[in-house]
Every structure is written in C-alpha cells, then in structure tokens.
C-alpha cells in the first residue's frame, strides 16, 4: 500500500471543488502546492474521495460482522456505520462485544417467551388463539389506522416544480465527452458554437448549428506545456474562457498558469505565459486587440492578442486577483481576496482609482453597459455600486444572508440594444437565492427562491426579459425579470456551475459537476 501526502491533498482539493467550496479549494490548493504536483487530474474520476471513503467504511462494517476465525456472525446484519463512528479507536472490538452480549440476551429472552407461550396455549381454545394472532396483512392500530400510514420521513422534501414549467427531455441536449467537472461554458457571439472548460485539462467547442448534420460535433482543445524540449499534456484545470467580439478566437486560462488563444476551428493561435501560478479570470476587450488576465500571483496582465506579448503587468494587489472586467478598450477593473478593487489603464504605472469598503474577499466585478457604474460582490454578503466620480460606494446593498458569488448587469438601458428598458442587476448567492435590483433606487425588486443549494451563475437573455440561474442543486431555472415568476425549469445530472444564453436568445447552455454540458432549446 502506498499513500503520499500529495495524493491525499489532491483528493481533498478535488472534493472541495466538486462540493462548491471554491474559495476553500483555492486556499488549500495554494498552501498544499497542488499546481506543482505531478498527479494527472484527468485520471481521477469525480467524487474520488467519497468513493474511497465509502470503500473504507464498508471494510470496517464487514470487519465488525466477521469472527476472529473468519466466519460470519450467525443472524448478524452488516453494521451500518457513520464515518465518524468508524474512525473511533477499537470500534470493531466494541461493536463485536456489544453484539455478543445482545445476542445472548435475545436468546435467553426468546427461550423464556417460547416457554410462556406454550404454557398459555395449552389452556386456550382455538378461537382464542385466532384472536391472539390476527392476520398479518393490513394490521390495524388501536385508533383504526393502518400501520405504516404515517411513517416518519427523515428525508428532506424534494423541491416541487410545476409541471407546466418543466422543460421536456426532447428540448434538452446533453453533451458528454469531458472526463471531469465542467466549470465554465460560453456561447460564440455570432454562431451556435458552445465552448466548455473542464477539470480534465481540456476545453471543447461544440457545434450546435442547425446545419451540423442533425447532431452536435465537438473539437477537443488539449492543453500542453513545454517540458524538456517537448510538448506534453497539461493536467491542470481550465479555469476561464472568453470569445472575442466577432467570434473568431477563444481565449482560455488554466491552472497551469498559461493563457491560450484558439481559433474557432480548434487551432492553437498563441500561448501566453508570464503568470507565476493559476489564472482565475480572463477577458477580451471589445475591440479584440487585447486580452486581460488575473492570477493567483496577485497580478493582472494585458496581452497583445496578435503577438502574444505581455503589454503590461499590474502588480497592485496584495493577494490573489479573482476577477477582471474592461471599462473600455484601455481601462479595466480588478478585484482580489485583499478586499480591494483597482481601476487601471494601459500605460499607467499606478491605479487610476482604488475602491475600498468590502470587509471580505471580493468575488466578482462588472461594469454596467455604459461603463459608468461598477458593481462588486463579496464574501461579506454585500453588493456595492461604485462610480469613478467618488471614492465611497454609491449603493451598499445588503439583503443576502450568505456570500455573494457572482453578479450580472442586464443588457438593457443606455448603451445597449434595448435602450427603452430599464437596467437591472442580478446577484447570485450561497444562500440559494437570486436577487434582482433596481440600481437607480438601490432596492431589491425580486427575490427568486426556488433553488435549494448555492447559486453559482446567472445570465440575462439578450433582450433582458429573462434570467437563467444555475445551482449546485442540479437545476437550471429561467425567470421572467419583470414579474419574478419561474417560467422554465430543468433538472440536470450534476451541480450547475455556469449558465449562458446564445446570441439569438433561444438556447441556454449549462455546465455541470458530473462532466456533462446541457443545451436547453427554449
């Protein structure tokens, strides 16, 4: 038997990721140097830690039920143990001794009961015996109710979804091919190509165009690193991806510290390597000439998309950078676990603005479509709205009861293709709710409450009339943004990490923890 600390750490790290503890997984991964291990994550199946724990538990259960000579205890059911009980010292000996004593008592009691029954039966008539032993079927209790009619249900009640809103199976396409959890997915902005990124160290481009011969085809983008003068497969997670505005190039960030740019046909165009650790976020600017990345090395980098050259590295955060977003083609904002938000501009050697006010890690930031307001969300359970015109936040929105994981602006209002509709902001939280906000008034207009687990992703339809949400409860919900009502619902086969709409607004893509990618035809 061989067990190394690297192997144990990797299984714990994967368990934290699969269970939705993204920040804990990140911290643990850094402290245990997961990125420096030689473990090939593509060979490790989902739920590996749980599986090996279950096997160990079954071994202890079987051990309790076996005599020292190897024979099984007579009339002994296999013990059902909890994990904590199983690790108690001497639990095997304690349970075996307790069962032996219980068995002796049961045998003595059975002998006494049998003797008493025989003596009693000798003095009873056949009719009396019949009354003493009524038929077993549908036994009646003293109040006339049937036994079992009101059994106690110790399981949580499953969520009930109205059948009218359930998306039928023929409207859902499940795409399989990834060998590990799929963290991210994104539609090409001009065609029905869906990109997905996974813990199996690959990204895939799925062709769902109507003319793709009736089925979906996939391109597998395998990440390689240079070792000893040769390209060898990387075994690190794909953490982020983003299409450029004309849909010709796909940029991806990885846990191996490299960003890569691929063509829509699956050809590697360039590899961007200057980060000293995993990349957590990356975005194209609108013009399509620069790619922006954020990493665990506390820096953000602007890359020339055509040459692959790092134009400028911004070392202003004091802890890992978690998210970035462009304000315009030259200026961007970044957030970090250091609780700060920096606004930086290409060519400037210091932040042009720094926003402080959050009291915990800042998970996500998003500029509104006009570039005037910046929204941020944090583990401090608040959502804040900032303006370049002032240092203090414009709104400090407090309603969620747990960490807020992500936020999205609606594609409505000024500077959008829907200028006559008012702008909204959506927030998704670990408290299992999604909230819609009127940013001008600073109030919550709707609280969407059908999910039962943390909500990891929200996305507005292109017209802003609908909002998709994805949760670790395996459900994708589609909501009406004006009424807050649930209009469509789909239960997948794994926890949902990401949801996204195609450009026409008639399909929703979702990526899941079991390695599946589903496409909902609305």
Swiss-Prot record:
What are the F-box-like domain coordinates in residue numbering?
A: 41-86
Sorted alphabetically, which CDD domains does this protein's record hold?
Answer: WD40 (cd00200)
Q: Which Pfam families match?
A: LisH, WD40
Tissue expression summary: Fetal brain and prostate. Expressed in the cochlear spiral ganglion neurons, and in outer and inner hair cells.
Covalent cross-link site, Glycyl lysine isopeptide (Lys-Gly) (interchain with G-Cter in SUMO2): 287
User: Ribosomal protein as a keyword?
Assistant: no
Which InterPro entries does this UniProt record tie to the protein?
Answer: Ebi-like, G-protein_beta_WD-40_rep, LisH, WD40/YVTN_repeat-like_dom_sf, WD40_repeat_CS, WD40_repeat_dom_sf, WD40_rpt
Q: What is the effect of changing residue 69 to V?
A: In DFNY2; uncertain significance; increased protein degradation
A biological-process GO annotation:
regulation of transcription by RNA polymerase II
Q: How does it assemble?
A: Probable component of the N-Cor repressor complex and some E3 ubiquitin ligase complex. Interacts with NCOR2.
Instruction: Report the protein name in the record.
Output: F-box-like/WD repeat-containing protein TBL1Y
- Organism whose genome encodes this protein: Homo sapiens (Human)
């Amino acid at each position: 038997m061989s067990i190394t600390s690297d192997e144990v750490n990797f299984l714990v790290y994967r368990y934290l990721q699969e269970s939705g503890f993204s920040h804990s997984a990140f911290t643990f991964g850094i402290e245990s140097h997961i990125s420096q291990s030689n473990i090939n994550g593509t060979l490790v199946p989902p739920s590996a830690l749980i599986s090996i724990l279950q096997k160990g538990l079954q071994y202890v259960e079987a051990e309790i039920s076996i005599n020292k000579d190897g024979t099984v205890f007579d009339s002994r059911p296999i013990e059902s143990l909890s994990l904590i009980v199983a690790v108690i010292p001497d639990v095997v000996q304690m349970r075996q001794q307790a069962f032996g004593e219980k068995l002796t008592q049961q045998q003595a009691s059975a002998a006494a009961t049998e003797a008493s029954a025989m003596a009693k039966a000798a003095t009873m008539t056949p009719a009396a015996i019949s009354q003493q032993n009524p038929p077993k079927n549908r036994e009646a209790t003293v109040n006339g109710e049937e036994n079992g009619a009101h059994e106690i249900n110790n399981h949580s009640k499953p969520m009930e979804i109205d059948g009218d809103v359930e998306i039928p199976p023929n409207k859902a396409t499940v795409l399989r091919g990834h060998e590990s959890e799929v963290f991210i997915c994104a539609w090409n902005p001009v065609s029905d190509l869906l990109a997905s990124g996974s813990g199996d160290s690959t990204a895939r481009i799925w062709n769902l165009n109507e003319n793709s011969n009736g089925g979906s085809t996939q391109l597998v983008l395998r990440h390689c690193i240079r070792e000893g003068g040769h390209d060898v497969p990387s075994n690190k997670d794909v953490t982020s991806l983003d299409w450029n505005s004309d849909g010709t190039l796909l940029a991806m960030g990885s846990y191996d510290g490299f960003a890569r740019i691929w063509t829509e046909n699956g050809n590697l165009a360039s590899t961007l390597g200057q980060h000293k650790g995993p990349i957590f976020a990356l975005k194209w600017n609108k013009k399509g000439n620069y790619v922006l990345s954020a990493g665990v090395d506390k820096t953000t980098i602007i890359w020339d998309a055509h040459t692959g050259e790092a134009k400028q590295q911004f070392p202003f955060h004091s802890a890992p950078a978690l998210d970035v977003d462009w304000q315009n083609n030259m200026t961007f904002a970044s957030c970090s676990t250091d609780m700060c938000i920096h606004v930086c501009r290409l060519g400037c050697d210091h932040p042009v603005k720094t926003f402080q006010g959050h009291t915990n890690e800042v998970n996500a930031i998003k500029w509104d479509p006009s570039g005037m307001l910046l929204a941020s969300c944090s583990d401090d359970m608040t959502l804040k709205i900032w303006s370049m015109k002032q240092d203090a936040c414009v709104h400090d929105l407090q309603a969620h009861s747990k960490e807020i994981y992500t936020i999205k602006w609606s594609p409505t209002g000024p500077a959008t293709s829907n200028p006559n509709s008012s702008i909204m902001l959506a927030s998704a939280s670990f408290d299992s709710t999604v909230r819609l906000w009127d940013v001008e008034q600073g109030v919550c207009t709707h609280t969407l409450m059908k999910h039962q687990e943390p909500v990891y992703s929200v996305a507005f339809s292109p017209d802003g009339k609908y909002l998709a949400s994805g949760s670790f409860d395996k459900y994708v919900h589609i909501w009406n943004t004006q009424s807050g009502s649930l209009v469509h619902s789909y239960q997948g086969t794994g926890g949902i990490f990401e949801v996204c709409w195609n450009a026409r607004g008639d399909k929703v893509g979702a990526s899941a923890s079991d390695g599946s990618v589903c496409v909902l035809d609305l």
